């Protein structure tokens, strides 16, 4: 019997494939994105030391929710926190999500606020 896998299972497989290639260092940490039904979470991770350097989510930002405006607010917030810690270059880890909509808005807001990836 052929069954269709859920989109979240397929996303996790894509994420594992990406994680074999993408890793963050102390000079260029990894910007990780997680998207839930209600909120958007972003964290900057140093994979060599396995520590989270800074994080932001749509609960902290002015715009609650998981829409494109919230993604832009979270992107600006994480860029502000990263620049305060002296982080300018990051590796973008989209966690298997398509580079479209909220993920693209978040990345564009980070770039506009001064992060480079």
From Swiss-Prot:
<dbReference type="GO" id="GO:0008097">
    <property type="term" value="F:5S rRNA binding"/>
</dbReference>
<dbReference type="GO" id="GO:0006412">
    <property type="term" value="P:translation"/>
</dbReference>
<dbReference type="InterPro" id="IPR005484">
    <property type="entry name" value="Ribosomal_uL18_bac/euk"/>
</dbReference>
<keyword id="KW-0687">Ribonucleoprotein</keyword>
<dbReference type="InterPro" id="IPR004389">
    <property type="entry name" value="Ribosomal_uL18_bac-type"/>
</dbReference>
<comment type="function">
    <text>This is one of the proteins that bind and probably mediate the attachment of the 5S RNA into the large ribosomal subunit, where it forms part of the central protuberance.</text>
</comment>
<keyword id="KW-0699">rRNA-binding</keyword>
<keyword id="KW-0689">Ribosomal protein</keyword>
<dbReference type="Pfam" id="PF00861">
    <property type="entry name" value="Ribosomal_L18p"/>
</dbReference>
<comment type="similarity">
    <text>Belongs to the universal ribosomal protein uL18 family.</text>
</comment>
<protein>
    <recommendedName>
        <fullName>Large ribosomal subunit protein uL18</fullName>
    </recommendedName>
</protein>
<keyword id="KW-0694">RNA-binding</keyword>
<dbReference type="GO" id="GO:0022625">
    <property type="term" value="C:cytosolic large ribosomal subunit"/>
</dbReference>
<comment type="subunit">
    <text>Part of the 50S ribosomal subunit; part of the 5S rRNA/L5/L18/L25 subcomplex. Contacts the 5S and 23S rRNAs.</text>
</comment>
<dbReference type="GO" id="GO:0003735">
    <property type="term" value="F:structural constituent of ribosome"/>
</dbReference>
């Amino acid at each position: 019997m052929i069954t269709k896998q859920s989109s979240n299972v397929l996303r996790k497989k894509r994420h594992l494939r990406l994680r074999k290639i993408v890793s963050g260092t102390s000079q260029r940490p990894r910007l990780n994105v997680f998207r839930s039904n209600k909120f958007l979470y972003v964290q900057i991770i140093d994979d060599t030391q396995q520590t989270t350097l800074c994080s932001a989510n749509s609960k902290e930002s002015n715009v609650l929710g998981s829409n494109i405006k919230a993604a832009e607010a979270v992107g600006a917030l994480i860029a502000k926190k990263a620049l305060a810690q002296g982080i300018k270059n990051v590796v973008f880890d989209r966690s298997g999500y398509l580079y479209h909509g909220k993920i693209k808005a978040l990345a564009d807001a980070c770039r506009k606020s001064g992060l480079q990836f």
